[in-house]
């Protein structure tokens, strides 16, 4: 890009890829909260528990693997509608001198290395902040969505 622009931010407090993610789109809104689990089987077990306890509809995306973080992921909605990511297998970011890795927005593998593309809700829905009116983004969004 001739003029690099910030499209998303992943923030962490404990050296993993992220705990909170903010992305471009109508907002400001919280996209999701990330919760690290020990391994891939914990993510699969969460799918089994949700499906067998009447919460299958809470599954929004996944399981799959992200290109950016290499994380094995599952996204679900909590009872209040907030998006939660269960993930594992990401890399550590403990070194403050670590050079950020740049990804092109038109690279579909940055979002999903393998697995189904994100649903439209992934780009159009988020948790609003109290007292802050969401507005259209300054940078247009052209998401790759599941059909």
What are these regions (language model features)?
Residues 17-20, 82:
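Short, charged/polar, Gly/Pro-enriched secondary-structure boundary elements
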Residues 35-84, 88-147:
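Vicinal oxygen chelate
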Residues 21-24, 45-46:
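A short secondary-structure junction signal
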Residues 7-9, 31, 70-74:
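Short beta-strand micro-motifs in enzyme catalytic cores
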Residues 12, 23, 75:
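Short glycine-biased active-site loop of nucleotidyltransferases that positions the nucleotide triphosphate
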Residues 1-17:
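Core segments of cupin and vicinal oxygen chelate
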Residues 19-22, 30:
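Solvent-exposed, charged amphipathic helical/linker segments at domain boundaries
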Residues 27:
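Long C-terminal interaction/binding lobes of large macromolecular proteins
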């Amino acid at each position: 890009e001739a003029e690099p622009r910030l499209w998303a931010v992943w923030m962490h407090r404990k050296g993993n890829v992220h705990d909170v993610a903010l992305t471009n789109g109508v907002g400001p809104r919280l996209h999701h909260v990330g919760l690290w689990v020990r391994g891939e089987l914990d993510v699969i077990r969460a799918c089994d528990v949700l499906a067998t306890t009447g919460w299958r509809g809470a599954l929004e995306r996944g399981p799959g693997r992200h290109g950016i973080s290499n994380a094995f992921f599952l996204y679900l909605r909590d009872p209040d509608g907030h998006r939660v990511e269960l993930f594992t297998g990401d890399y550590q970011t403990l070194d403050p001198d670590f050079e950020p890795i740049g990804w092109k927005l038109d690279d579909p593998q940055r979002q999903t290395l393998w697995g189904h593309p994100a649903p439209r809700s992934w780009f159009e829905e988020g948790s609003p902040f109290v007292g802050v009116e969401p507005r259209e983004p300054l940078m247009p969004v052209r998401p790759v969505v599941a059909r």
